């Protein structure tokens, strides 16, 4: 009887750990995903980089993406 209870508890613990790990992996945003200024939402080795958009001199808002940490984009010179 003790063996059945122990086995049941062990299985419950294993299933719980697998579920928690799956939730933690799905909680972060992959590379190229739209993010907010909350840097914690991007997966490891990624940061949320934002820039302001302009069209014909008028600001059209801010866009943010998860990109590799340290990577910098710059405007192409025409």
From Swiss-Prot:
<keyword id="KW-0964">Secreted</keyword>
<dbReference type="Pfam" id="PF10530">
    <property type="entry name" value="Toxin_35"/>
</dbReference>
<dbReference type="InterPro" id="IPR019553">
    <property type="entry name" value="Spider_toxin_CSTX_knottin"/>
</dbReference>
<feature type="signal peptide">
    <location>
        <begin position="1"/>
        <end position="22"/>
    </location>
</feature>
<dbReference type="GO" id="GO:0005576">
    <property type="term" value="C:extracellular region"/>
</dbReference>
<comment type="similarity">
    <text>Belongs to the neurotoxin 19 (CSTX) family. 07 (U7-Lctx) subfamily.</text>
</comment>
<keyword id="KW-1015">Disulfide bond</keyword>
<dbReference type="GO" id="GO:0090729">
    <property type="term" value="F:toxin activity"/>
</dbReference>
<feature type="propeptide">
    <location>
        <begin position="23"/>
        <end position="26"/>
    </location>
</feature>
<keyword id="KW-0800">Toxin</keyword>
<protein>
    <recommendedName>
        <fullName>U7-lycotoxin-Ls1e</fullName>
    </recommendedName>
</protein>
<keyword id="KW-0732">Signal</keyword>
